[in-house]
């Protein structure tokens, strides 16, 4: 009795609830729009087709297995199946795609320097021909209740939409990792095959024998049913990918789309889809790819956090962070103090040119010449139109302070003599980053403008929080910094007695590490409430960025209190403390759900 409703209660509603629970903290406005849009399209498109199948006797339902209410002869349970299947598959695709910067998978197919782009055009045509044949062939095989009618109806109904979606989204379908394209198709498909097998065996629904081919994938699972669930999940995921393709184009190319709202309109999405691939800016795509590579390699905490920032804010934050890391690497890895100083000068000249109202494109390109090719691609995309210049110059001051460790006499007169020196250094290299990040947050705010007092308060708190994160970084890297001849623990704190043994010195260093860590947590506790005053769309990402880094501090604090070594690696760089991947993900999810760590 009411077997169809029981199928939902036992098999479809629980995974939908589970996915909702996992995704709820991570949902963005675009995710919600995507779900609502796909549900509307899927249900609207399926109702006429399903109604025809039932009215012509291809599908039947024993009266005792359904509750009774129908729409166009479709049982309420069947209508709910359209909704719940679409919802489950959509949520899975959104979850699996959170880490992807989709714009990095776009290609200009006319660019001779991009061989993959040219091959994509060939695959596009091959896919169109294949899908076209799959659509035309059933139409040529006749109509009526003959063997294979159900399969023909599936193909005639689904393939035109698949052809359209392939034409729009083939680039992403071919280049995205399979875990983002095939996995969200196959997981729900396999699950629904099992459910369908159980339902067919129990007689919850059945297919008329003269309308099917008589082939079973396994006992009780007809080939048509297997194809139906595979095709419908493919429709859903390809539709989602087409949406992602449109949004990626809108976000990636401000030259064509200067303003993109938080939730793009259908008309704007179509404009993104119809933009010719020959107009895609290859240099911008490659620069973004290089920036993302730098981010993934240099900061796993910020890489995790970037996945919950929306749209163009995410892209610009990646570009900003990549600029900072490129500068740090070129200056830090210089073979001599003189070479490092030269790099600081080159970056200063680059900023002078980028922010000058008098410089032209030729002067800008000339300022990039001294840099490596990959660095040029990153620097070229720095969003200077949205960033104040002073924090970037202050960042260079921090690098200059770093270089004083390698000048003659630095051992007797180190650059970090007092806590004020340490505070100044952290302000240069980290408080500036907090200010720059929040500048981007306010520039991209899709809601009403924030009042100036709140903005100033949040930017000040963000700068302080940047210092706190830098203190955690300093505590973590004491040993690796020492190997390169640097010590950021204020020199005046140390006992200058020559009689100090290595054991005493180690205890002293551990004590000062804890002292700096305590200062970091004090600043963190004082300023973290300001995050809740930021624009709503960015709060979650900022929370994750801060908490992911402070979790390193918590692990350091725990180990200091237990007297354990601090060079543990949670999967990161050897000799450098880091948080294991699963713990980082757990912290990120809990933070998005509203959790706040201990201060």
Predicted regions mapped to residue ranges:
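Aromatic-rich, lipid-facing transmembrane alpha helices and their immediate juxtamembrane interface loops
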Residues: 1-288
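Catalytic cores of Mg2+-dependent Asp-rich isoprenoid enzymes
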Residues: 253-468, 475, 479-599
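Transmembrane alpha-helix/helix-exit interface in multi-pass inner-membrane proteins
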Residues: 50-51, 193-198, 470-484
